[in-house]
Amino acid sequence: MANTNIKLLLRGETPRLIDEWQIAPKFWDAVRNEVDKRDDDGQFILTGSAVPPSYDEIFHTGTGRFAWLKLRTMSLWESGDSTGEVSLAKLFAADRTDYFVEGINPIDLEHLAYLTCRGGWPKALDKKSKQAALQQAFEYFEAVTRFDVSRVDGVNRDSELARRIMRSYARNQGSQATAGTILADIANNESTEVSENTIYSYIKALKKIFVIEDSTAWN
């Protein structure tokens, strides 16, 4: 329907949510045009788990019409696992002379390890057992390496190589690991020759589906 009568999909009560809009990139310009006609804020919410595979069907940047918001998994405070007694924002505030760090953390080391592995996936929080909650991360990892890393731009990629790259990224978390570093890390277990360009291709695909996000300098 997006290819035949996209305006029909924009009708209805607002704000109107269009999920996974990147599957039909024509929504971008259609929404931009509709926003100009209505001349009102908060008309549409476009959500997606990846960037569009191609921008050939997008002809306008959307400047002045769209506001960007990046969603991540929940923090421990959002999931209810942290008391939130210590504020990171206040710790790094310019004027913090009157802020005293105090609080009691009920989380022991074993439970902290569990929370780290579980992550902040909303679906994981609804599970009745820890094992079921942990399984969500494994299922996401499997879906990313089997399907999403190739589907994002239509390039057929090896799922096992995708797994090794993600594991290498995990081992190098918090460091400035180059493609060469990743390549050297996985070379010992890779039977076929892999180039840096191939590594870059996988990394680019993983960034497009928001699996990898480079940390910016905090200062």
Locate the predicted segments by residue:
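Structural recognition of the conserved hydrophobic beta-strand(s) that form the central parallel beta-sheet
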Residues: 17-18, 43-49, 70, 79
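Conserved catalytic/switch belt of AAA+ P-loop NTPases
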Residues: 28-52, 60
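Short regulatory helix/loop adjacent to the ATP-binding pocket of P-loop NTPases
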Residues: 33, 52-68, 80-85
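Accessory nucleic acid-recognition modules appended to NTPase machines
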Residues: 125, 129-219
